[in-house]
Amino acid sequence: MNTVRVTFLLVFVLAVSLGRADKEENRMEMQEKTEQGKSYLDFAENLLLQKLEELEAKLLEEDSEESRNSRQKRCIGEGVPCDENDPRCCSGLVCLKPTLHGIWYKSYYCYKK
């Protein structure tokens, strides 16, 4: 009976001591995993930031192209209203007050010289 008790006690002591070692190993593993997770999150965050910056650069580039294409024409054609203080009539045209048929518009138009 004593041998059974001694054997049981020996097995119990080994189990407890190995269990503590496993507990320490588990704690170390968990720390490593959380550190790896943090580094992965940092990597993912940096990657997302780079993609957003590229997207922003493309959008700004498209805006600048759009503004270049949508600029106003350089001159105004014949029969088109113009501003007497800032005439933008094309060459060969003059910004004049309309005669007869356009009197009621109270505006200036580009006419041939």
From Swiss-Prot:
It comes from the Eukaryota. GO terms for molecular function: sodium channel inhibitor activity; toxin activity. It is found in: Secreted. Residues 1-21 form the signal peptide. This is U11-theraphotoxin-Hhn1a. The presence of a 'disulfide through disulfide knot' structurally defines this protein as a knottin. Keywords: Disulfide bond, Ion channel impairing toxin, Knottin, Secreted, Signal, Toxin. Pfam families: Toxin_22. Belongs to the neurotoxin 14 (magi-1) family. 01 (HNTX-16) subfamily. Its main location: secreted. One of its GO terms (cellular component) is extracellular region. The keyword Cell membrane does not apply. Residues 61-83 are annotated as: Disordered. Probable ion channel inhibitor. Disulfide bonds join 75-90, 82-95, 89-110. Expressed by the venom gland. The lineage of its organism: Eukaryota, Metazoa, Ecdysozoa, Arthropoda, Chelicerata.
